[in-house]
Amino acid sequence: MAPFLSAHGESASSSSSSSPTPSRHTRNQHVDYSTPGSTGYNIPQNTTWNAPSNRKIRVLTIGAGISGILMAYQLQKHCENVEHVVYEKNEDVGGTWLENRYPRAGCDIPSHAYTYQFALNPDWPRFFSFAPDIWAYLNKVCETFDLKKYMRFHVEVVGCYWQEHAGEWVVKLREHLPNHEVREFEDRCNVLLYGAGVLNNFKFPDIPGLQDRFKGRVIHTARWPKDYKEEDWAKERVAVIGSGASSIQTVPGMQPYAKHLDIFVRTGVWFGVIAGNSGSQAKEYSEEERENFRRDPKAVVAHAREIEEQVNGMWGGFYAGSMGQKMGSGYFRTRMAEHIKDERLLQGFSPKFGLGCRRITPGDPYMEAIQKENVDVHFTPVESCTEKGVVGGDGVEREVDTVICATGFDVSYRPRFPVIGKDGVDLREKWDLCPESYLGLAIPDMPNFLTFIGPTWPIENGSVMAPLHSVSEYAIQLIKRMQNENIRSWVPRQDITDSFNDHVQEWIKHTVWKDDCRSWYKNNETGRVNAIWPGSSLHYQQVIERPRYEDFEIHSFNDNPWAHLGMGWTVQDRKGPKEEDVCPYFNVKNIDPKWYEACGGDSRLLVERPEESSQAGQQFLWPTGT
């Protein structure tokens, strides 16, 4: 177990190799055992064990998307004496669900699985919801629990700087005011939570001539212009570059209206069924179904569980050579053949890699759209752009009016601004070649810092919502320990983190992700997988259920790291038996039924657990025996 370090970073267990450790006690040594403070150490008098009042903690969250909203709720519900502020660069909450407004932008996880567990939503309009539906849900969560009071909008983070002595992060911020002026200011926090997301920093493809030669319009799906609508598409020939999730959603949204679509695809796609037993990809919930969900919470829970069980049940198919991999691949190939009648298209889209190497995508509307007369699919990358159009790897120039780049995001995990941790370490440089984390949520050299959906996280298997909830609970445990023990800083050890990542990379070799496929899960130049957690979603949740404090370097504000014991008072002791339970160990639920039966009692009384009040205690009589 790693030693607990003092305020000066000195371990109580450290010793010099050149000389023996001196004894704390020697004969004839005069020691004052009666005068408080005679050793120079004074016990804090007002400290109470597990009392939030011991210390105020300030938490700063970057981003008001899924993660930032979750932390606002969790801190409000579970923490006392904690200040929380969320800075968001956009004008409102929602993150990616506010920003992405391309045609049919939505989630590839069924709606009832893409929900906070404390706020199951009976009002989802369809099985796979679109971005406006998801944004409306997130906004309702914020309004219901009054969470926007913690949030400041139009404020972007420009840099984060760790202050070792103070145990704080200094966060430099830039606010864009309504009068178009810009105000720069600083904030400080004890805990910094990075919730900006990994699919947040979009990038255009590096195609010669795309930005400086082509005379038409160039659009990235992540920044879809509000004024580019159906009536515009009807007049244009449009090129769509990419075959990932945004392309698979955009194409069927544009196809019915566009004059012509040229789609450029260089990688096959697994068009799959996700929780197919619970609803079709086009299913809309009727008002009767939604009313039933509103009236009966058990019904909405049962539906969410049915979906989640099917999604999580896919996990076994991701192991290379497994029966699940073989059966799943065969089923999906057969299903694709049923939907794609054109043999050239079927062969072009059929992946040359295992099921799951790239994210499995629900794509029934896409498979239908690519077979329409106004759509041509080219299985080639775009090599360059001319003034009038695009040139594929086949050397053919195709004239278009607009180029849509459905090419994803910068998934290097590197923050867009300086994050300077211990000893001047810049997270951007630390992650320049190879992003590695501790359990997907913490990083060596970055004290009091947690990231949501970091490298090596369960992004590949189902909904992110349950793992995110586990990360939020992990953060709360650390914050409460900081309060109780007056901890200045905690940071995962580099050697422990290295060993964890060695395990991850060895584990990858047993899975489908070792295959040669282009995916944002991996570095496509080196082939190293950076995104995947080495286990199922449920596996991750159980692993991080409680922090492994032995994996951390922990520094206290106190020279004596046991000063947080104070004068020995608990909250219950301070308030007394009229307000608190001062003997919680005497409890009906602690009685072993076998023992109670041996004493002549009826153990069913224990199962029913009568009310543990003073009156219930008077009514509950021990058997006299025989």
UniProtKB/Swiss-Prot annotation:
InterPro entries: FAD-bind_Monooxygenase_sf (IPR051209), FAD/NAD-bd_sf (IPR036188), Flavin_mOase-like (IPR020946)
Residues binding FAD: 96-99, 108-109, 114
Needed co-factor(s): FAD
Pathway in which this enzyme or protein is active: Mycotoxin biosynthesis
Binding-site list for NADP(+): 106-108, 243-249, 266-267
Family: Belongs to the FAD-binding monooxygenase family.
Identification of the protein by name: FAD-binding monooxygenase moxY
